[in-house]
Every structure is written in structure tokens, then in C-alpha cells.
Amino acid sequence: MVSDRFGFGDFQYEVVPDWGISSELGVVSDVATDSNDRVYLAVRNTAHTETPSGVILVLDQHGNLLDSWGQDLFSTPHGIWISKDNKILLADSSDHTVRSYTTDGRLEFTMGTQGKTGESGCPFNRPTRAALSNSGTLFVSDGYGQDRIHKFTGDGDWVMSFGETGKGSGF
């Protein structure tokens, strides 16, 4: 018997068939929800014919399309994260930037230099995700090219970086 329920204990999830606008969205690289239960999808290939315009698709909790934005703004959206106060952070791994947006797609600030990798140890070289702590500190994983975590103020000012490429063979 095939089950549509996954997980363990209090963390069990069930497949909801036919939820959302289309199963033909293309490459969805990440998903996040805001404090109003809106669902944000980061879509990489907007050339996919069934994908609505916009790189960020905003759905209601039932999967209906509410909004889309970001067309022609991103190279490769990789990670999306939304704070408790609905600040949206989007890491663009090919563009070497992390950007902060409002829920309606208004840019607040950009970290990194668009299209330019940071020097060794400096932000960014293909950032993958950003997250804001409860204390307002911003952390960015820069794993593809830097193998580092960068720490910033909540306004995007760099504080420090840590980590390095490992010397072992891995797992």
C-alpha cells in the first residue's frame, strides 16, 4: 500500500492532490510562507510556457495565484526566506546577490555586487540562502563558491564571515 502521509510523530505531512495553480511550473527552487499564510515560490525558469510571468509566485493557502513579480530581476533564484514581519530575503546564486523585498515585490536593499563574485572569503560567490535571526542578525550561506557563512546586521552591513573549504574527502 502506498501512503500519501510522510514524516514522524508531530511532524507528519499529507499529499494534497490537485493543490495549486499547475503542476507545470518549471523549476521551483524554494518555497516559503509569510505571516498571512501566503505561499511564495521561487521559480528558476520562467521561459517554461506554463509558468505565469514573474519569478516569485504568490499563492493563497488554497494554491490560487494571487500575484507574481520579479520578471527579469533574477538570474538563478536559489533560496527564499520570510521573516515574522514579512521581510523577504532572496539569494540569487548566479547573480551573487542577496536582496530584501516587501511582500509586494518592492526592493529594500541588495547585498553583493550584481554579476560579480566576491574576492576569496568576501561575500558573495553563489549564495544559496539567507535567514534573519530573532535578534535581527542576518546570516547568508555562501556554499557553492565560498564555503562560508556570512553574518550581517539586519540592514545588510557585513559583520564577519566564517568557514572554509574542507580538506577531507567528505561523506
Task: Locate predicted features.
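Eukaryotic scaffold repeat domains enriched in small/polar residues
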Residues: 1-171
